Amino acid sequence: MPEQSVLPWDADGPQSILKGEDSMYNPTKPIDKEVLDGYNRGVERGRLHTGIGLIELARTKELLLERLPKPPAVLYDIGGGYGEYAWWLASLGYEVHLFDLAETNIRLSAELAAEYPGVSLCAAEVCDARDVPRPAESADAVLLMGPLYHIPEKAERIAAVRESLRLLKPGGLLFTPAITPYATLLWATSVFGRDNRLIAEDAFMRMVERELTDGEHIRPPAAETAY
């Protein structure tokens, strides 16, 4: 959870996105089918329990515990996958509602119940982060820790953030990660080390250039590349 605006291009910070014409930010574009298909294959299950995912899990939990209000606060975990954080937070006494776009993730979340005997979620529902079926000012905190990097268009990202802000009670907290525009370039040049040849691929470098200029990570067609 970086200590910066979730919308770095907006000098007035996240609250300023509530200004202006509503029609400008209506969520009309569906999430890319490739993204949804991937999650419906269960690719997220177990990711946080291996490799660098272990660091992500531990650090995220640390930051959440530092900043969340005390239980039994109402938390909405939007785009929360199969509920790794949702179930953990519920075990701490929070009233947790889990939402995810992938039906498979919601089904998988039921499997975690066995790891938390006597614990339950208030809800586990399929929905879009830009249209959450809950009343305004009904959550003490919203976790929006997955959806934004799957929504490359600025207006659609704003729609997702506006929806989270709508749900928050006055003084509520919104948690969302930020990914540096240099992430793909750093991934290519450090994770694979000296054997990596991605920076010699035109398609890869075009993708990186777009990330650095527009802040949008748009993968080339699968036939061209695997990244």
Stretches found by the model and what they are:
Residues 24-79, 84, 88, 173-209:
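Conserved class I S-adenosyl-L-methionine
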